């Protein structure tokens, strides 16, 4: 029986400062939540081994700073991503409005092979708070307009839907990784034009 190689899935979490990106990651990986807010500087990541459809994979979850001055770090952190998680705060409408720019920024920086079908997942966080400002239907409509992105409403504090959301993230990331592997195993043939063939023929001539 041949053993499958270990799979590393790179997941990027994006969104404005204070929406709960770090808290969601810590709740999922460490089952912990802290009320003390500490802004992420640059980027940080945690890893977690999970089973996805009977396959053991390692998720490398990158938590990036939401401040604009750190967006220039993007290329190094975004490249090679298998899934991108967009997070907004349901009590802060402005964090929802910026999802478009975060999505566009990721696609520019990461340059995925198939941007139209690259897997995103959207999390509407902080549903444990009472002063909700962004309606579920509004968020669902936005996700539907962007190639039907999966949408979850979460609470990092109360651990609501966090596990379920990351299961979907892992499954979609694994699907993306598998498609990239297949693409790399069967690259498109290189087509030579007449000049290239003539040049190759001349170089191989022994006379």
From Swiss-Prot:
What does changing residue 161 to T do? In CMT2B; does not affect interaction with NTRK1; results in higher levels of NTRK1 and MAPK1/MAPK3 phosphorylation after NGF stimulation consistent with enhanced MAPK signaling; increases interaction with PRPH
Residue window of motif Switch 1: 28-41
| Residues the entry annotates as binding Mg(2+) | 22, 40, 63
Question: Outcome of residue 183 to A?
Answer: Does not abolish interaction with RILP and localization to late endosomal/lysosomal compartments. Does not abolish interaction with RILP and localization to late endosomal/lysosomal compartments
Q: Name one GO biological process term.
A: intracellular transport
Record comment: activity regulation? Regulated by guanine nucleotide exchange factors (GEFs) which promote the exchange of bound GDP for free GTP. Regulated by GTPase activating proteins (GAPs) which increase the GTP hydrolysis activity. Inhibited by GDP dissociation inhibitors (GDIs).
Show where the record puts the motif Switch 2: 67-82
Provide the effect of residue 8 to A: Abolishes interaction with RILP and reduces its localization to late endosomal/lysosomal compartments
Where is this protein found? Cytoplasmic vesicle, Phagosome membrane; Late endosome membrane; Lysosome membrane; Melanosome membrane
Entry similarity comment: Belongs to the small GTPase superfamily. Rab family.
Free-text function comment from the UniProt entry: The small GTPases Rab are key regulators of intracellular membrane trafficking, from the formation of transport vesicles to their fusion with membranes. Rabs cycle between an inactive GDP-bound form and an active GTP-bound form that is able to recruit to membranes different sets of downstream effectors directly responsible for vesicle formation, movement, tethering and fusion. In its active state, RAB7A binds to a variety of effector proteins playing a key role in the regulation of endo-lysosomal trafficking.
Q: What is this protein's record name?
A: Ras-related protein Rab-7a
């Amino acid at each position: 029986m041949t053993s499958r190689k270990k799979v590393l899935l790179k997941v990027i979490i994006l969104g404005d400062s204070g929406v709960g990106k770090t808290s969601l990651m810590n709740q999922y990986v460490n089952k912990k939540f802290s009320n003390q807010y500490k802004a992420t500087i640059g980027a940080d990541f945690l890893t977690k081994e999970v089973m996805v459809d009977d396959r053991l994979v390692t998720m490398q979850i990158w938590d990036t700073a939401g401040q604009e001055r750190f967006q220039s770090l993007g290329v190094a952190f975004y490249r090679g991503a298998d899934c991108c998680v967009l997070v907004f705060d349901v009590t802060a409408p402005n964090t929802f409005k910026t999802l478009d720019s975060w999505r566009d920024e990721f696609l520019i920086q990461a340059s995925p092979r198939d941007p139209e079908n690259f897997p995103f997942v959207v999390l509407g966080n902080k549903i444990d708070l009472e002063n909700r400002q962004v309606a579920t239907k509004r968020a669902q409509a936005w996700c539907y307009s962007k190639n039907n992105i999966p949408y979850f409403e979460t609470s990092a504090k109360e651990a609501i839907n966090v596990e379920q959301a990351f299961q979907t993230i892992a499954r979609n990331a694994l699907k993306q990784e598998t498609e990239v592997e297949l693409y790399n195993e069967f690259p498109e043939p290189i087509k030579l034009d007449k000049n290239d063939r003539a040049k190759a023929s001349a170089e191989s001539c022994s006379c």
